[in-house]
């Protein structure tokens, strides 16, 4: 099995690192495409030994499981570009927020009668094999296809199948959740520094507190409210701190954050359905539609041993 990523950004980098660290895939079995080869994430993928190309079509040809790891509004243009190269063997996995299975299937069915499509939502902690992933299978995807994706994603954290109409809410909760946690941790560390702690120690203590709390919750069957109560002594420091958080609307802010992320996810789907995208974004993403300033394109070609090597064709294209 080989895995391809259309897009070589943070998500592709995190998944590739997670898959290789888990031992479920070797780096030479992974390929990623990006129109820009000087990105930090591309450099990280290169150091891992992942195959890299500027051609999205090349990525499709050399993969069995294909992750669409680009911005939601770019998905329709990607599908138009690679549709003719998608074959019956491919499992097309959309990781883009808000992009529905039906919209991907509709595009691909112009080229292939029964495309196997899976929609998933994951998060960046897959990098350290502590991700949270849900997925929903499309009309033509087999049970075995879903099981294969679950095997992949379970190697980098928690993974479960859900109904598709729940995925937007998942995006607002666990998809965006790490950012909420990082912001909270940054603020906690600031509080520690304000009260005299060195920054490095404050960050470490805050991170360990969040990590420990999460592990306690996952390892127990207790409600988070009960675990919270267990920390609060009558008249103690913690209950006074919680009162301060409550008076500032702490719970409501988190609820509203999840809701805002979910609503924005649905707006992104609307943009994707209308195929709205700026010319600049299109130029950055689609190599085959918009010529890059440099006519040299790095592609991958199989050798007689089955390995993939990079090659650069002789420049011959004209600039627009």
From Swiss-Prot:
Gene3D superfamilies: NAD(P)-binding Rossmann-like Domain (3.40.50.720), ProC C-terminal domain-like (1.10.3730.10)
Modified residues (Phosphoserine): 304
Catalytic reactions on record: L-proline + NADP(+) = (S)-1-pyrroline-5-carboxylate + NADPH + 2 H(+); L-proline + NAD(+) = (S)-1-pyrroline-5-carboxylate + NADH + 2 H(+)
Organism domain of life: Eukaryota
GO MF, one annotated term: pyrroline-5-carboxylate reductase activity
UniProt: L-proline binding residues: 164, 237-238
Pathway in which this enzyme or protein is active: Amino-acid biosynthesis; L-proline biosynthesis; L-proline from L-glutamate 5-semialdehyde: step 1/1
Binding locations of NADPH: 8, 10-11, 34, 36, 56, 70-71, 97, 230
Region entry Disordered, spans: 298-320
GO CC list: mitochondrion
Modified residues (N-acetylserine): 2
Biological process, per Gene Ontology: cellular response to oxidative stress; L-proline biosynthetic process; proline biosynthetic process
Cellular compartment(s): Cytoplasm; Mitochondrion
Residues reported in the UniProt entry to bind NADP(+): 6-11, 34, 56, 69-72, 95-97
Function text: Oxidoreductase that catalyzes the last step in proline biosynthesis, which corresponds to the reduction of pyrroline-5-carboxylate to L-proline using NAD(P)H. At physiologic concentrations, has higher specific activity in the presence of NADH. Involved in cellular response to oxidative stress. In some cell types, such as erythrocytes, its primary function may be the generation of NADP(+).
HAMAP family: P5C_reductase
UniProt name for this protein: Pyrroline-5-carboxylate reductase 2
Source organism of this protein record: Bos taurus (Bovine)
Lineage: Eukaryota, Metazoa, Chordata, Craniata, Vertebrata
